[in-house]
């Protein structure tokens, strides 16, 4: 386990209800390639804040890396709608590209 993960685990232990601490731990797991552990943290964060677009995108990326194509498509579709609702052009383009590639079988 790397120092970044340990630091974020300690922060979450101190502040278990802090969504940013939970997101940071999930992102540390994601960056370490531990997509199952990352997704667990992201799903908890998303339950507390269902409109968190970045978390929704990362859940889709976790699913994709784990070979869960249908789940990734569902996550990216939700993220696309959040990007539209929140007027985020960059993430919208990213989700449209990801969905296009998944629909094309890529």
Predicted regions span which residues?
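Structural marker of alpha-solenoid helical repeat scaffolds
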Residues: 14, 48, 82-86
């Amino acid at each position: 386990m790397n120092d970044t993960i340990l630091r974020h685990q300690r922060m979450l232990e101190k502040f278990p209800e802090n969504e940013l601490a939970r997101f940071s731990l999930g992102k540390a797991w994601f960056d370490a390639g531990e997509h199952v552990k990352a997704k667990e943290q992201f799903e908890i964060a998303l339950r507390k804040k269902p409109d968190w677009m970045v978390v929704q995108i990362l859940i889709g990326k976790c699913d994709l890396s784990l070979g869960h194509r249908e789940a990734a498509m569902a996550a990216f579709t939700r993220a696309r709608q959040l990007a539209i609702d929140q007027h985020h052009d960059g993430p919208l383009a990213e989700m449209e590209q990801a969905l296009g590639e998944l629909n094309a079988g890529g």
